[in-house]
Amino acid sequence: MKSKLPLILINLSLISSPLGANAAKIYTCTINGETVYTTKPSKSCHSTDLPPIGNYSSERYILPQTPEPAPSPSNGGQAVKYKAPVKTVSKPAKSNTPPQQAPVNNSRRSILEAELSNERKALTEAQKMLSQARLAKGGNINHQKINALQSNVLDRQQNIQALQRELGRM
């Protein structure tokens, strides 16, 4: 227990400290031809221009143009050129004409009638399954299955009543 106490205290101090206030400057380094990010500056590193973490927007971040790296002796004096592709963000064109909408009551009524039809079909199917379970061959009556089927039939009946009430309000 004593050995875990310092670890717990360190974790609590990390959790309670605001990370945004302690954010360090980030540097980009090119080491052996690979880009590495670090918080410790060195000779081959330069400051990066990264967007802040947690900044949400609908626009994409466009990388700034970086200076070309100096030729390194490891690649035979040839300069490796890398330019980040610059992408322009275009906003979608907005249509001035609103879409044609059908009358709300007619479409709602047709949806409710379709749902009522589906519920009636589901009710007859649930009633068939319940009657088959009650007439089980060999005397093996599964009471849990019968209770679940009865609950299903009751749910369907209540759904039908609710749909009929809703249609009656129109």
Swiss-Prot record:
Keyword Coiled coil: yes
Superkingdom of the source species: Bacteria
Keywords assigned: Coiled coil, Periplasm, Signal
Subcellular location: Periplasm
Segments for region (Disordered): 87-107
Record's signal peptide: 1-23
Recorded phenotype for the gene knockout or disruption: Nonpiliated colony morphology with non-domed, flatter and larger-diameter colonies without dark ring at the endges of the colonies as opposed to wild-type. Reduced DNA transformation competency. Reduced total PilE protein level. Loss of type IV pilus (T4p), however, there are some PilE proteins detected near the bacterial cell surface. Simultaneous pilT deletion restores T4p expression, has higher total PilE protein level than the tfpC single mutant, yet does not restore piliated colony morphology of the wild-type.
Major subcellular location class: periplasm
Protein's UniProt keywords contain Lipid biosynthesis: no
Function: Required for stabilizing type IV pilus (T4p) in extended, nonretracted conformation on the bacterial cell surface.
Protein name: Type IV pilus assembly protein C
Organism: Neisseria gonorrhoeae (strain ATCC 700825 / FA 1090)
Gene: tfpC
